[in-house]
């Protein structure tokens, strides 16, 4: 259950270091991190989660979504992904190795996707995941 004292807000430049440290700790996509692409979930002024929306000319990509261990399974990740989708102005994709989480939020696995996402797919496959473990999913609105 989402904590009552949770707030979701756009990240500030001052949040950049914490986001980067947590993203690295969680082995998430840390390529070209820009603080202004993120939202953060805060509880008692502490960042407990974060999510990123990368905007490309042809689509948007939900990426680098993480929640600290003690706050997982409380719906915070889902809440952040829904907020990122809400703010997107184009088709939304995600490249992931946890498709069940994103299926619950309305994403479906696709075989065709914008070429701009191929680099991310290749990165995931090079990072100890095989073809059957890396999924590109599209938000079905």
Give residue ranges: language-model regions.
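C-terminal "cap" of GNAT-fold acetyltransferases
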Residues: 115-141
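A short helix-loop-beta-strand connector motif used in the catalytic cores of GNAT acetyltransferases and
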Residues: 29-40, 44, 61, 130-133
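Conserved beta-strand in the GNAT
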Residues: 40, 46-55, 59-66
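A short, internal acetyl-CoA/4′-phosphopantetheine-binding micro-motif in the GNAT/acyltransferase core
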Residues: 65-72, 98
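Conserved active-site alpha-helix within GNAT-family acetyltransferase domains
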Residues: 96-123
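A short beta-loop-alpha structural element at the N-terminal edge
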Residues: 5-18
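Helix-loop element at the rim of GNAT/NAT acetyltransferase active sites that forms part
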Residues: 10, 21-32
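Conserved acetyl-CoA-binding loop-helix of GNAT-fold acetyltransferases
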Residues: 73-86
């Amino acid at each position: 259950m989402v904590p009552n004292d949770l707030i979701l807000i756009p990240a500030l430049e001052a949040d950049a270091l914490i986001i980067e440290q947590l993203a690295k700790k969680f082995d998430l996509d840390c390529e070209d991190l820009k603080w202004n692409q993120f939202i953060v979930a805060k509880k008692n002024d502490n960042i407990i989660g974060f999510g990123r929306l990368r905007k490309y000319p042809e689509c948007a990509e939900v990426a680098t979504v993480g929640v600290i261990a003690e706050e997982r399974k409380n719906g915070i990740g889902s809440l952040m992904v829904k907020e990122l989708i809400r703010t997107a102005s184009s088709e939304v994709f995600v490249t992931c190795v946890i498709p069940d989480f994103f299926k619950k939020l309305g994403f479906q696995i696709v075989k065709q996707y914008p070429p701009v996402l191929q680099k991310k797919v290749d990165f995931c496959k090079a990072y100890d995941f095989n073809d059957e473990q890396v999924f590109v999913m599209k938000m079905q609105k």
